[in-house]
Amino acid sequence: MAVKASFLAGTGILSVFGDSLDNTITGSRDAAGTILINGGAVAVTGGHPTVANTTLIQVFGQGGNDTITMNEANGALPAANLFGGAGNDTLTGG
């Protein structure tokens, strides 16, 4: 299945889901404020999340030994909830 992401513009929620494998998921932003998942390698369906229109980022690692990180090197991100799921996970907030 790999990592998938969807954005609900009406609620401002960006949801990211891993699978049963060992996933590395990194949320970040570019200088213009676009929110990126794995540096833009994961396409976001449903809209274009930015720091201006996103109220919450939810990341669900699910099974496997996941590494989930919020990288704020390019500026602050919206609030985020990180859920590792089953496995030995590493969660790092911004």
Residue ranges and their predicted role:
Residues 1-94:
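Acidic, glycine-rich low-complexity segments
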